[in-house]
């Protein structure tokens, strides 16, 4: 999932959980398309053709079920992974620390007829509800960098995977959205301490995800890292401005702001946009996909 928080990681987890509890209903609408494109790219590195109704996949830090939707429902037009959705449907279990996200997952399950899926409120670094060697794959899309102890999370993935199973994690490499949000924030409140969508800088590197997976028990020779470009497609300049005015991004930023300051937001967002972004309605985003196999 995306993240807005402060620089101290222990406080950021509390902030993040509260933020997504409050804004869970808007997450899929405002961030879902980009997250879906990245998740589809990540899933393309799994042996999808080998999965069947007897397979079991863990959607960890599942949010509203973006990974699960790709596995079980017809793909959106901008996703072209031939093996998606998987048929026959595998069993998919979704977990998320945010209760509202799990409720959203369950609502999607009901409306989209995910008869082979279920979801639970569960910390992704504590998979004690699951047995050893239970899953054929574990997928954590944009979640590993939010854990208190990412290595413990990786070790739990390793434990619950069957021998020969795959764990896939994703993290960002570049985030144009962050530059725009930060630029607008700094223009209005130059002395603010807030860092929208803050991530520890090391998580933007290619080396960090693979080092965490290796420390969690995966053999170095069984870890590969790939790059993806799941750009944020808003359709137009107005689409970008509208998207970056969503409470998903602004509810934390606007805390304590005056009406005058809030009124400046859209204008400052426009000032941050490059000419090509205004013409295309596209913001560049790139990401790392780390794939680890349990030997």
Describe the role of every protein-language-model region.
Residues 1-25:
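N-terminal, positively charged/glycine-rich alpha-helical extensions of SAM-dependent methyltransferases
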Residues 33-54, 70-74, 78:
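Conserved alpha-helix/loop element of class I SAM-dependent methyltransferases that forms part
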Residues 34, 66, 202-295:
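Conserved Class I S-adenosyl-L-methionine
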Residues 50-51, 75, 86, 161, ...:
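A generic alpha-to-beta junction signature in SAM-dependent methyltransferases
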Residues 55-128:
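Class I SAM-dependent methyltransferase SAM/SAH-binding core
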Residues 125-138:
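A short acidic, Gly/Pro-enriched loop at the edge of an enzyme's catalytic core
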Residues 136-150:
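A short SAM/SAH-binding and catalytic strip from SAM-dependent methyltransferases
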Residues 151, 158, 164-235:
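Conserved catalytic/acceptor-binding region of the Class I
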């Amino acid at each position: 999932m995306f993240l807005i928080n402060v620089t101290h990681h222990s406080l950021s987890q509390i902030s993040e959980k509260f933020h997504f509890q409050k804004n869970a209903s808007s997450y899929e609408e405002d961030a879902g398309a980009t997250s879906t494109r990245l998740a589809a790219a990540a899933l393309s590195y799994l042996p999808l053709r080998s999965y069947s109704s007897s397979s079991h996949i863990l959607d960890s830090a599942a949010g509203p079920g973006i990974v699960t939707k790709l596995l079980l429902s017809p793909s959106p037009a901008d996703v072209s992974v031939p093996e998606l959705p998987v048929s026959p449907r595998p069993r998919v279990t979704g977990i998320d620390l945010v209760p509202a996200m799990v409720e959203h997952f369950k609502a999607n399950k009901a409306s989209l007829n995910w008869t082979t899926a279920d979801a639970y409120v569960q910390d992704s670094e504590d998979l004690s509800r699951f047995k050893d060697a239970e899953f054929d794959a574990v997928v954590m899309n944009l979640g590993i960098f939010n854990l208190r102890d990412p290595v413990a999370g990786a070790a739990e993935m390793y434990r619950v995977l069957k021998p020969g199973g795959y764990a896939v994690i994703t993290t960002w490499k570049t985030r144009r959205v962050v530059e725009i949000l930060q630029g607008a924030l700094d223009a209005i409140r130059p002395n603010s301490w807030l860092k929208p969508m803050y991530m520890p800088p090391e998580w933007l590197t290619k080396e960090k995800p693979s080092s965490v997976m290796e420390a969690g028990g995966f053999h170095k020779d069984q870890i590969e890292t790939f790059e993806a470009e799941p750009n944020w497609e808003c359709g137009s300049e107005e689409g970008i401005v509208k998207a970056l005015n969503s409470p998903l991004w602004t509810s934390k930023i606007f805390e304590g702001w005056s009406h005058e300051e809030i009124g400046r937001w859209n204008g400052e967002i426009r000032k941050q946009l490059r000419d090509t972004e205004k013409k295309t309605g596209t913001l560049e985003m790139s990401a790392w996909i780390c794939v680890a196999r349990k030997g």
